[in-house]
Amino acid sequence: MKDDIVIVSATRTPVGAFNGAFANLPAHELGKTAIRAALERAGVEGGRVSEVIMGQILTAGQGQNPARQASIAAGIPVESPAWGVNQLCGSGLRAVALGYQAILNGDSEIVVAGGQESMSMAPHCQHLRGGVKMGSFEMIDTMIKDGLWDAFNGYHMGTTAENVAKKWQITRKQQDEFAVASQNKTEAAMKAGKFKDEITPVTVKTRKGDVVVDTDEFPKAGVTLESISKLRPAFDKEGTVTAANASGINDGGAAVVLMKASEAARLGKTPLARIVSWAHAGVDPAIMGTGPIPASRAALKKAGWKKEDLDLVEANEAFAAQACAVNKDLGWDTSKVNVNGGAIALGHPIGASGTRVLVTLLYEMQKRNAKKGLATLCIGGGMGIAMCVER
């Protein structure tokens, strides 16, 4: 009999705005909070953890192995290894897939997998080992260079969204309508307390004392088509992608605890879901936002599912243009996609988002008694990743 790999707990921090509540918290502090809470929710002692795997993209100046820093700070003994993975925006979901594989192969028994990112703390830098003999020099923004800049074509991720909009014929109005729907769904979900179960509050030390952050900071209330249609294009003056129909620049952390179903039963834990399949795929870097199309198809094929079998989908909204293209190409029921809004409203802490979308999916599946779900993200450099889970 097959011993499934299951997710026994899942949680995330609130998503912080750029230079907002978490402006001075390094990524490993956000990761620490998520890891510790995930273990507490699972009822698992840190000493039982075989390894910790954390997605993170912006590691410049963050110290050796931020995943290890988060792991030890969360109370996991030094005997349990920890390491980081960088598959850009897919990192947090790839970390979960790697944990799944480690348990499946018998290399680990219990894995904490997740993602952590502080875009606010990404430093500016310059290579000065040879010195600057004369003249000025420019500081490089590592957040853009390492996280948001296409290395193959030499332009911003926003330009890839413009490419997708043209190729898939997604108009400015369609993008703005999608963005408004995302914001409005998130506003309604927050008023209904939909995210409270999945969020673990973060305590931030300030000069005036401790401040507890327990709510997503980025969503905007009362967004209308009229209010965002006035914005100018951000990447091409003749383009359609704006700050309002793109995801945010954000900080956050998320984590899940993985083990075999037999181990969960032994511990008396009811899993949130079992991992049925996962897949990643490559596309032209110039249209990286379409990566979820082949990745989702591959994950569904591995699972033996059809798109019609899906009860819920969480698809990361890097840009409205790519989200619309993914929906259009896959032809799935959009009423089941991002039912509480997505990254355009909630934000996109790049290395953590893969786990964030999975966590949000798992809790909404629980609320709706949904059976089959899929989480997917596009990935800079021309890739996509997807995972199928079942309750």
What are these regions (language model features)?
Residues 87-117, 159, 165-194, 256-262, ...:
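Active-site-proximal alpha-helical scaffold in enzymes
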Residues 1-25, 224-290, 294, 359-360, ...:
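Condensing-enzyme catalytic core mediating Claisen C-C bond formation in acyl metabolism
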Residues 110-164:
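Flexible glycine-/small-residue-enriched beta->alpha junction loops
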Residues 23-111, 116-134, 199-214, 286-287, ...:
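Conserved beta-ketoacyl condensing-enzyme motif
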Residues 160-162, 195-198, 205-206, 276-345:
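Active-site pocket-lining segment
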Residues 56-110, 140, 152-156, 222-248, ...:
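Conserved catalytic cysteine-centered active-site region
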Residues 11-13, 24-28, 32, 41, ...:
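N-terminal extracellular/periplasmic Venus flytrap/periplasmic-binding protein-like
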Residues 28-43, 66-70, 95-98, 157-164, ...:
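Short, well-ordered amphipathic alpha-helical segments that serve as non-catalytic structural scaffolds
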